[in-house]
Amino acid sequence: RALPPHCRRQRQMCIRDSSDTSPEISDIVDLYQDELMLFERYHIEDQIKKALDRKVWLPSGGHLIIDRTEALTVIDVNTGKFVGKNSLEETVYENNLEAAEEIARQLRLRDIGGSIVIDFIDMESTKKQQSLLNRFKQELAKDKTRTQVFEISRLGLVEMTRKNVAAGLVESFSEECEKCNGRGLIIN
């Protein structure tokens, strides 16, 4: 029951640190037997913490800020340390392309669903804007979960929806702060 459906469909091998495995899935579940704890060996806790962080670094030095609210998820793209080798417009375009790929990955990884607004870095060229949107749609096509992407708004925002399939990663690994009631700040 707890085995992810994609593991059953794709016949991937799963590792378990307990020997009590249901007979119907025993052919795709290996028992992990090592002195080093499973989470330690594969740095799973570090990976989960990284996947829950609101700041996601891009390989070039730019970064994403991912904020979840009750109404929607907002993703802000920033150049950060990325200065590029070409014109400012080309640097921004390259950063946005890299961000488009990573945003699609983060949506899958974090299982983010519902309404999503993305604030890519502003670009003057409508040709580059359309190219970015096409690239983003290509990256989203790798996702088995249904998505819908709308045109870039007059404010330069990309609005999209992604079907809610289950509780996302943040919801699965967190609880509301008792001190601030989930606001993220305490009023003095």
What are these regions (language model features)?
Residues 26-64:
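A contiguous, basic/glycine-rich beta-loop/short-helix subdomain that forms a polymer-engagement track
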Residues 16, 37-43, 158-162:
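Short, solvent-exposed polar/charged micro-motifs at secondary-structure junctions
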Residues 20-21:
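Predominantly extracellular/luminal regions of secreted and cell-surface proteins
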Residues 3-6, 56, 107-108:
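Structural motif
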Residues 1-15:
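Single conserved hydrophobic/aromatic residue that forms the stacking wall/gate
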Residues 8-9, 24-35, 146-154, 187-188:
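Interdomain boundary/hinge elements
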Residues 8-12, 33-37, 120-124:
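Conserved short loop/turn motifs at secondary-structure junctions
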Residues 58-188:
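Conserved glycine-centered short motifs in functionally critical loops
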